[in-house]
Amino acid sequence: MKKMSRNVLLQMEEEEDDDDGDIVLENLGQTIVPDLGSLESQHDFRTPEFEEFNGKPDSLFFNDGQRRIDFVLVYEDESRKETNKKGTNEKQRRKRQAYESNLICHGLQLEATRSVLDDKLVFVKVHAPWEVLCTYAEIMHIKLPLKPNDLKNRSSAFGTLNWFTKVLSVDESIIKPEQEFFTAPFEKNRMNDFYIVDRDAFFNPATRSRIVYFILSRVKYQVINNVSKFGINRLVNSGIYKAAFPLHDCKFRRQSEDPSCPNERYLLYREWAHPRSIYKKQPLDLIRKYYGEKIGIYFAWLGYYTQMLLLAAVVGVACFLYGYLNQDNCTWSKEVCHPDIGGKIIMCPQCDRLCPFWKLNITCESSKKLCIFDSFGTLVFAVFMGVWVTLFLEFWKRRQAELEYEWDTVELQQEEQARPEYEARCTHVVINEITQEEERIPFTAWGKCIRITLCASAVFFWILLIIASVIGIIVYRLSVFIVFSAKLPKNINGTDPIQKYLTPQTATSITASIISFIIIMILNTIYEKVAIMITNFELPRTQTDYENSLTMKMFLFQFVNYYSSCFYIAFFKGKFVGYPGDPVYWLGKYRNEECDPGGCLLELTTQLTIIMGGKAIWNNIQEVLLPWIMNLIGRFHRVSGSEKITPRWEQDYHLQPMGKLGLFYEYLEMIIQFGFVTLFVASFPLAPLLALVNNILEIRVDAWKLTTQFRRLVPEKAQDIGAWQPIMQGIAILAVVTNAMIIAFTSDMIPRLVYYWSFSVPPYGDHTSYTMEGYINNTLSIFKVADFKNKSKGNPYSDLGNHTTCRYRDFRYPPGHPQEYKHNIYYWHVIAAKLAFIIVMEHVIYSVKFFISYAIPDVSKRTKSKIQREKYLTQKLLHENHLKDMTKNMGVIAERMIEAVDNNLRPKSE
């Protein structure tokens, strides 16, 4: 799970917290005192209670055993630091104390404890009492239980296969199903309407941590030039606090001895993250309960994507086996390898001067491999994948709608608050057109226009830099091909082991793919920082807006970075090369690359294999080894105190912090993989299989990291997968075009079909029946050696003997023809067939896609009914409760009125 270092995030802070400013103290009335003078002289200053560790390592409570720890703040005691440069420590202490004082003023309760292993560290435990939870639950529009849900779930559709699905499902005796409730946004004045059996259990730990984090993110601690500074994120980034996190509930390897601990972390590790559970379904409800909806929806999506990949992988393997089993029947490959056909065809040099003439049969092995991938099965698989991706997206929408209902996120958009970073910049006052009330915004319409323009320009500039790197790879390919052509063994018979498997084209393709992969990894590191800086400057209002904006920028960068080399090989290489007598030069110096006689499809397959495989290996190294090694190093440094009993908060502190963007990079990794699986699948039918194996491991690796290597994430709400959904839809539409063009222009399928149906028989051919015999000879044009220009004339070798002509891959008239070296009739037939194929394939697949999209509703009828039923019952329940309250109140009022009337009518005593 990739993350950015604290130093990187520090550099991206737009304002430093080292500036002098007024320390801010707040009371419950939100009064801000800007001029406090010396903090030590303030009687209003409040500090957390210091308590010694009580020796209970699994405790999740304050020392009193009653107040639950909802969040932990960690700082290094300034009085015990070794250095104090220019009063920096004193400034940090003042800000921290002001911040903690304001937390107490907001109703939070704090308790401080020194570290057991390092007495410089102080852990501040934060508890939110009932009144604070209720107040902010209403502010945040958090949905809470009204009454148990009495709607019955539909029985399983698998019927007799229940025994099989039961094996794959989570054991309900271990992870008990959560009770479902009707819910509504919490309101304090309707507290009696809610299902409050136990106040301590009404707000679950994830909700408590979410509320506390909301408060921590908005409490002020300093004012500089009338601009407030607030929030725990800024304090952590500036080093005032070393960490801030909610607690895991127990150790992951064994259950807690504390009877009040739910042991959810242990259950997640045992039934989800452990390798022995790799075949089981994910406990999504428990994941959502422990980590929040945002983490839950990611694993739900990844699991569903992986399930759908199973079908694609099966069909892909079938198409691969079809090509593999039929490669011995590949007539054109036999002609390439035949000593009397391919062994006697002299091919023209593919570069100037240094490149030799060569015999066609040295490409025998590559032609055999090409038969596996360039077969009829490839066409079938490309059409299938065009339909598969639509089915996946449509069925995922339905599954997502079910999760929205089950997890109470149907109307989540009403809950989201502005980001603290946005609120801190709101200095301009405008009139809201809807409410006609004053509101603060960070910049005017003109300022917003300038920011958007600058951000768009920056994105465009960096995309151009990526394209420049791709051009550099192309220049490398053009240059190194000449070197390999001159240096590799020149055994023209193709029997030397090196020459047999390592042709100049193959060597160039492999080395260029490896270098391209290395450059991609380097550029990724740079572009991550750039995209975050641009998005921070753009200043989106909500966290969803921020993530969606960053998502689009990162995807644009990654799209160009990962796919540009594949697009070059698929659609540009070998397409604009001219012919030996008049070659086309790149940048006026480098002669354009040519494809093998069988086309560039095998090279595209090689590129995809190296990038997909290398990316998977590199990501696993980053995701598994790095956190494990960092934690191992941390344990090694703490070995001196290993015999001491350490509390839960200190154990969690020594875990790795999650990156600021959470699972953003996990989504990005999977979407890039989704692009490889769909955009170029016509050249590599095994891509879904590789993706399937990777994702099965990815789910468990991510689960293992979250439960064992990382601190607990702050639970967050999420309704869907955000901007990734339209990105996948865009990829799905583009994939139809790319696969149609790969089959038409990159593979040799269309020229073979044209030859088989038109040019193998009269009037163009000499055969009496449709056949592929003679295809190679028909697709290689003749060039007269004497027509070479001095610049491009090849380097002949004595092994070839005397020859006056050579062959090259194109459809042109031979020398001596009235239209010598012009495109012949075969060329125009092939072009017409390619264009017709693209039009037909696109229209057929798009028609099927649109029909499927129309036929499959985004929300199932049953889910719609359940949502409407719950809304109806919720409104009915609230209405009934409201009537009861009204009746009760009216009864009280009526009694008082009757009593007043009686008092007025009663005769006064004389």
Swiss-Prot record:
It is found in: Cell membrane. Residues 322-375, 477-509, 573-601, 744-836 are extracellular. Glycans are attached at N329, N361, N493, N777, N790, N802. GO terms for biological process: activation of blood coagulation via clotting cascade; bleb assembly; blood coagulation; calcium activated phosphatidylcholine scrambling; calcium activated phosphatidylserine scrambling; calcium ion transmembrane transport; chloride transmembrane transport; chloride transport. It is a multi-pass membrane protein. Exhibits synergistic gating by Ca(2+) and voltage. Inhibited by some non-specific cation channel blockers such as: ruthenium red, 2-aminoethyl diphenylborinate (2APB), gadolinium and cadmium ions. (Microbial infection) Activated by SARS coronavirus-2/SARS-CoV-2 spike protein. Homodimer. It is linked to Scott syndrome: A mild bleeding disorder due to impaired surface exposure of procoagulant phosphatidylserine (PS) on platelets and other blood cells, following activation with Ca(2+)-elevating agents. Belongs to the anoctamin family. This is Anoctamin-6. It comes from Homo sapiens (Human). The lineage of its organism: Eukaryota, Metazoa, Chordata, Craniata, Vertebrata.
